[in-house]
Amino acid sequence: MLKEIGKNAVKAAEQLKTVNTETKNQILDHMASELVKDVDEIIDANKIDLENAKQLELTAALTDRLTLNKERIQGMSDGLKKIIPLDDPVGQVTQSWKSEDGLDISKIRSPFGVIGIIYEARPNVTSDVSGLCLKSGNASILRGSSYCLDSNLMLSLIHISEPTRPL
């Protein structure tokens, strides 16, 4: 299963490196809008995680980090929207010079390809890193805590949903 996830991520990375800035920004806007639109479904999934946290007797601090409510989901949406005006790093020339032989040399930013991210019981990170990886042209493999499995699954489903308008 992990091998398949990795192969799919590499395929996605190949496609992502060719996506233009306008399309990335449209996708980010779509992701942000879907969070707000699907707030009730996200909260329902989060309730399952919170019930499990109660049964596992997790600390109040950890349970608070797991909790998603309308305000926090709006904050996640706002966070994605804040990525939109950021410069797209892909293709930026950071340095250029001419060698002694007359060869033009440039340092150009390019995507890594696939970024793996392991994070704790913070379902909001799912949206944050998805958006940042998209903007930087990278595919991502996310591994969130099992404490917020249902929340992360719902957020992932929302983020991979097809836009309702053409990009």
Where are these regions (language model features)?
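Short, cationic motifs built from Arg/Lys/His that form the positively charged side of catalytic pockets
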Residues: 24, 143, 163-164
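Conserved small-residue-rich beta-alpha loop and adjacent elements
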Residues: 85, 89-157
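N-terminal Rossmann-like NAD(P)+-binding subdomain of aldehyde/semialdehyde dehydrogenases
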Residues: 1-104
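Single conserved hydrophobic/aromatic residue that forms the stacking wall/gate
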Residues: 158-167
